[in-house]
Amino acid sequence: MFHATTILAYKGKNKSVIGGDGQVSFGNTVLKGNAVKIRKLNNGKVLAGFAGSTADAFNLFDMFENLLQSSKGDLLKAAIDFSKEWRKDKYLRKLEAMMLVLDRNHIFLLSGTGDVVEPEDGQIAAIGSGGNYALSAARALAKHTDLDEEELVKSSLQIAGEICIYTNTNIKTYVIEDEK
């Protein structure tokens, strides 16, 4: 379980959105409440969020971004190549971390054990200590409301932040809209 992080991604009809809270904890102490755990990649066409050690996040983001560039923006190929590299590298294999990556076509959960998982519904995925709360809220809101994609992510993370002690309600979202 990765404490101090909740990341939620939603691939809707018109937009793909990823959001995260801002809390960083060490044991039972909140160290920071406004951390940003999400990055835009590939000129904003891919969004990525991270759960795990903050120090490792920058290396993993850079590694994934390089693979995304070498695959000419093909998210599926980059995700698979990233997973292979993560499993092969002795240092990276020891990391207990997860990433969510998405574009307008795909959403993937990448784990430190080399898994590349596309959610069954192809629309909603969450990671981190409040991930299950955010995922549950997002599924319910998607099914029973007419919230737009960004509001759905914000509302779901708000709910997670009200339940999970390792998640706060300082929510940051990033959006990819359909090209016009």
Curated annotation (Swiss-Prot):
InterPro entries according to UniProt: ATP-dep_Prtase_HsIV_su, Ntn_hydrolases_N, Proteasome_sua/b, Proteasome_suB-type
What residues sit in the active site?
A: T5
UniProt-recorded Gene Ontology molecular function terms = metal ion binding; threonine-type endopeptidase activity
Catalysed reactions, as listed in the record: ATP-dependent cleavage of peptide bonds with broad specificity
**Residues reported in the UniProt entry to bind Na(+):** G161, C164, T167
Superkingdom, natural source:
Bacteria
Q: Which UniProt keywords apply?
A: Allosteric enzyme, Cytoplasm, Hydrolase, Metal-binding, Protease, Sodium, Threonine protease
Which EC numbers characterise this protein's activity in its record? 3.4.25.2
Q: Does the keyword Cytoplasm apply?
A: yes
Any single Pfam family the record assigns to this protein: Proteasome
UniProt-listed CDD domains: protease_HslV (cd01913)
Localization, per the record, is: Cytoplasm
GO BP terms: namely: proteolysis involved in protein catabolic process
Top EC class for this record: hydrolase
The record's principal subcellular location, in a coarse class, is cytoplasm
Any one Gene Ontology cellular component term annotated for this protein:
proteasome core complex
Per the similarity annotation, which family is this? Answer: Belongs to the peptidase T1B family. HslV subfamily.
What quaternary structure, including any partners, is listed in this protein's UniProt entry? A double ring-shaped homohexamer of HslV is capped on each side by a ring-shaped HslU homohexamer. The assembly of the HslU/HslV complex is dependent on binding of ATP.
The free-text function statement in the UniProt record for this protein reads: Protease subunit of a proteasome-like degradation complex believed to be a general protein degrading machinery.
UniProt protein name: ATP-dependent protease subunit HslV
What organism is recorded for this protein?
Answer: Campylobacter jejuni subsp. jejuni serotype O:2 (strain ATCC 700819 / NCTC 11168)
Gene that this sequence comes from: hslV
